[in-house]
Structures are given as structure tokens and as C-alpha cells.
A protein has these predicted regions:
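A hydrophobic, multi-pass inner-membrane permease signature
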Residues: 2-294
Length: 294
């Protein structure tokens, strides 16, 4: 029978634990502060007295959200953006990374394509030309302006390419000898063997689309077509009472713009908090597959 020796806590370990605990508190407290603010009474929030626990428990901010049709309209735009954007981006990532992962002697042009992508990552045409381009393509005030410009994120494409390189190329050659075409090889060999990596990049795309606000702010003027994060940004930066209905102004007097915005941030965070636990088990595995070389 073997017994494990207890390791003594050294000074170095204690320092590491303290630093990690402090980092955990720094990361967790902003979310906790937003949560308690959303449930606190406006008197305590405006006085700056809410720090650790909710004061004067109040759920009127969440009741106001349930009556805000524009909030749910913006959320529906974000949901559509996540579904369509992730589907388009993952498809583009897979079909672009696959031919670039093969050895250069099999596909000599891949070297030049990689340099072309790298140049696009390093140099940008600028915001104003890009804005004009969106207008010329009639994408201004169009849902697809949230999808098409970022349909192929180049950094994620490089990660996907490295993930595919971990699949032995001998499998590709064996499948070719057996009569499989490139599409069959991709979707029956590479994709199933790269599920953790694909799930990892899917999480990146999901968070990116859900948290995106700048494109909606720049290219969409119609509030009914803007995504949720743009809607919340507009509320947090500018609160225009001239465009609000009388019942909204009365509700704002009973709550607070701070508590209302905090409640909307909490509601907007829920989809990420719900999706992440299911993909977390793939996250570390997927990143290791692209980072470790033997």
C-alpha cells in the first residue's frame, strides 16, 4: 500500500496562489458588481453604495426589459448573426484551411496564397475606404454587413490550418488510393478528427459575433436592425430622452439608467454563459492540438 507524501507549501507556491486569487477576483468582480447593481434600488446605486451585495432589492429593471420591444429586436438580430455568422465562418475556415495544410510539394501555390493572406492581416485599406465599399455593395443598413466582411477571419484560418496539419497526411494518401475525392477526405477524415479544434474556433466566432458592436454602429443606422451590443452601447453612451415614450420616461424615473443598463448587460451575457460550459472541454484540447508539435 502506497501513501502519497504531502507536499509542503513553500513561499513560492503561496505567492502563486495569492496572485491567482487576486487575478480571479479582478476578473470576477466586474461581473458581480454589474449583477448586484441590476438588482439594487436606484437610490443606493446613484449614491455609489452598492459594492458587495444588492441594496434595496429591486427587479423593476428586468421588468422594464421585458417590456422593451427594441431590446428583444436587437437580441433577435444578434441571435441571427451568431447562427448565420458562425455557420458561414466555420464553412469558410474549413474549406480554406484544408488545401493550405497539405505539403507545399503537393500544392506549390499554397505558399503564395499564405503570403497573400499574411499581407492582408498586416495591412488594411482603412476605415473610410471600407465604409465606401460597403455602400457600393449596397450592404449599408443590411443584415449581411454583419456577416460578410468577417466571413473569413484570417487568424482563425491559420489556427485551423495548423490543426489540420496534425492529421497524418498518410490518411489523405490512403483515402485517395481508395478512390475518395478531396471533399470526402475533408468531411470524412479531417473534420471528424479535428472536432475539438473546430469547437474551439466555433467558440471564438460565437463570442466575436455576439460581442460585436462596432460594425452595427458604423454601417447600420436603423435601430431595429442593430445588434444587441450596439443597442447597449448606445444606451451606455447616449441616453436620448427626446426619442423615448412617456411610459419609458416614467419607468426610468422609478429605476435608474445605471441599473437598467446593468440588467441589460446581464441578460446579454446569458447566452455566452450558457454555451461556454458545453464547449469548455474542447477548448484546452483544441488549443493544444495546434500548439504542440512532435
Amino acid at each position: 500500500m502506497t501513501t502519497k507524501k504531502k507536499q509542503k507549501l513553500t513561499g513560492g507556491h503561496a505567492v502563486i496562489i495569492i496572485v491567482l486569487v487576486l487575478l480571479a477576483i479582478i476578473c470576477f468582480y466586474p461581473m458581480w458588481y454589474t449583477l448586484i447593481m441590476s438588482f439594487s434600488d436606484k437610490v443606493y446605486v446613484d449614491a455609489g453604495r452598492t459594492w458587495l451585495i444588492p441594496l434595496g432589492l429591486n427587479v423593476k429593471s428586468y421588468g422594464k426589459i421585458l417590456k422593451d420591444s427594441l431590446f428583444f429586436s436587437a437580441m433577435w438580430v444578434s441571435v441571427k448573426r451568431v447562427i448565420v455568422g458562425c455557420a458561414v465562418s466555420m464553412f469558410m475556415l474549413i474549406i480554406t484551411a484544408y488545401p493550405l495544410c497539405v505539403p507545399e510539394k503537393k500544392f506549390p501555390a499554397s505558399k503564395y496564397i499564405k503570403w497573400f493572406f499574411l499581407a492582408n492581416m498586416m495591412f488594411s485599406g482603412g476605415l473610410i475606404p471600407f465604409y465606401s465599399l460597403m455602400r457600393q455593395y449596397n450592404l449599408f443598413n443590411n443584415f449581411w454587413v454583419l456577416i460578410l466582411p468577417g466571413a473569413l477571419p484570417l487568424w482563425n484560418m491559420i489556427l485551423m490550418m495548423n490543426f489540420f496539419r496534425n492529421v497524418p497526411y498518410a490518411l489523405n494518401e490512403s483515402a485517395t488510393i481508395d478512390g475518395a475525392n478531396p471533399i470526402q477526405i475533408l468531411f470524412k477524415i479531417y473534420v471528424p478528427l479535428s472536432v475539438p479544434s473546430i469547437a474551439c474556433l466555433f467558440l471564438f466566432q460565437f463570442v466575436g459575433h455576439w460581442n460585436g458592436y462596432l460594425d452595427g454602429l458604423l454601417y447600420i443606422n436603423d435601430p431595429a436592425k442593430q445588434p444587441l451590443q450596439t443597442y447597449i452601447y448606445n444606451l451606455s453612451v447616449t441616453l436620448d430622452y427626446s426619442t423615448m415614450r412617456s411610459e419609458d420616461i416614467i419607468a426610468m424615473a422609478q429605476t435608474s439608467d445605471k441599473t437598467l443598463n446593468a440588467a441589460k448587460v446581464i441578460v446579454a451575457m446569458l447566452p455566452i454563459l450558457c454555451v461556454y460550459p458545453f464547449i469548455q472541454k474542447y477548448f484546452t484540447t483544441g488549443m493544444n492540438l495546434g500548439a504542440v508539435k512532435e
